[in-house]
C-alpha cells in the first residue's frame, strides 16, 4: 500500500512584514530610522558571514562581493555581482520587500546594512553605497562597493 505524504508550505508574508516594518520605521525621525534599519541589516549580515565562513575571511574583495550576491539571491534578492572600470557592484533584480520598499524607501537601508555586514565578515570593512533602487524608480537595486 502506498502512503501519501502531505506537504504544507507556509504562505510568504514578506510584503506584510515589510509594510509593518516600514510603517514602524516611519514613526522615527528619518536619520534615526535609516541608522536603525542599516544597523539591523549589518548585524544580520555579520551573522550570515560567520555562518558562511566561520573564522575565515575571503582573500579578495571580488570574491567576497560574489559571495554576498549569491547569499542575497538565496534570501530573495535575485542578485549578481559585476565589475567595470575598477568598480564592483551588486545588482539585485528583485526585492523581497516588494511594494513595501517602494512605499517606505528606508527599507533599502536594511539591504545596505546586509551588504556592509557580510563584506565586513568576509573581507573587511567597506563603505557600500546604494546607487540605484526600485524605490527611486530604477529597474534594479545597485550597490557600489
Where does each model-flagged region fall?
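Conserved segment of winged-helix/HTH DNA-binding domains
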Residues: 2-30
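Short, internal active-site loops enriched in acidic
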Residues: 4, 94-97, 134-136
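Conserved active-site and cofactor/substrate-binding residues in soluble primary-metabolism enzymes
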Residues: 16, 63, 110
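Amphipathic interaction/junction segments at domain boundaries or subunit interfaces
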Residues: 28-107
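Short terminal or interdomain "cap/linker" segment that borders an active site or interface and mediates
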Residues: 69, 80-82, 89-91, 125-145
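Short secondary-structure junctions
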Residues: 72-77, 119-127
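Non-DNA-binding regulatory cores of transcription-related proteins
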Residues: 102-118, 122-123
Amino acid at each position: 500500500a502506498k502512503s501519501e505524504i502531505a506537504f504544507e508550505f507556509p504562505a510568504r508574508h514578506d510584503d506584510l512584514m515589510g509594510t509593518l516594518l516600514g510603517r514602524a520605521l516611519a514613526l522615527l525621525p528619518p536619520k534615526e530610522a535609516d541608522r536603525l534599519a542599516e544597523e539591523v541589516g549589518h548585524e544580520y549580515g555579520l551573522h550570515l558571514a560567520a555562518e558562511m565562513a566561520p573564522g575565515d575571511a575571503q582573500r579578495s574583495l571580488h570574491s567576497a562581493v560574489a559571495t554576498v550576491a549569491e547569499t542575497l539571491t538565496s534570501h530573495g534578492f535575485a542578485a549578481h555581482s559585476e565589475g567595470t572600470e575598477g568598480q564592483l557592484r551588486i545588482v539585485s533584480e528583485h526585492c523581497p520587500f516588494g511594494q513595501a520598499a517602494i512605499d517606505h524607501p528606508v527599507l533599502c537601508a536594511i539591504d545596505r546594512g546586509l551588504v556592509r555586514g557580510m563584506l565586513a565578515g568576509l573581507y573587511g570593512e567597506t563603505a557600500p553605497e546604494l546607487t540605484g533602487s526600485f524605490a527611486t524608480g530604477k529597474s534594479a537595486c545597485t550597490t557600489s562597493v
